[in-house]
Amino acid sequence: KLPPWSDEPPPEMKLNSRNVYSVLVNAQNQLLVRGEQMQIHDLKHNTKIFIANPEKRSDMSENPQKAIISIKNDRGTKYNTYLEVYNELKAAYNELWEESAMAKFGKNLDQLTAKQTKEIKDAIPLVISEAEPTKFGEEK
């Protein structure tokens, strides 16, 4: 059932920028992650550190449940590059889930019960936000 109609604008959601891991892919297939250039092969490792924040740094996510991965590409980005970036981000979550399953239950994720798997994924929810592509790199 839908909520009743309202002419009031929706409440503004405030996101703490420390919890947002922004990944931009430009038309030259280069990455800008949280304002810094990064190579694709470093993305998974750095994403894991951001989500888990083992050192409790103030410039990383408060905790895995608040971490948001935001990916935005340019219309000129090669599809294979976009897929490679997305797969690295997803792989970061997969590794965190595996590590958590082993630490908590002493088993691989695929050996857990449905309830145990849910517990792991609730503690480290997969949140990848995909923004509309930009047109900056299009040729005129």
Residue ranges of each PLM-predicted region?
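Long, low-hydrophobicity, acidic/polar, solvent-exposed interaction domains
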Residues: 1-140
